[in-house]
Amino acid sequence: HALEDWAETWAHYLLMHETLETAVEFEVIRPPETDREFHVWLSEWMQLVLVLNALNRSIGNADAYPFVVSTAVQKKLQFIHDLMHDI
């Protein structure tokens, strides 16, 4: 189901992108000085979700982001990230 995988990868990328933008707007993280390379962007994401998950756990809630970003998923997300930055 290639089209389903493509759509799910886009949805996941957009979720990550919008959450990072919201974190910048609320001054939870610093805005990027330049366009972020994928590995920097992903690292910022992973740091943010560690905090989000810890906050949720501290009040007895389930993880906000219970996913593992495998190497295969990273490659798919990087393709979309690069595509977005080439536009």
Q: What does each model-found stretch correspond to?
A:
Residues 2-87:
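Pan-zinc metallopeptidase signature
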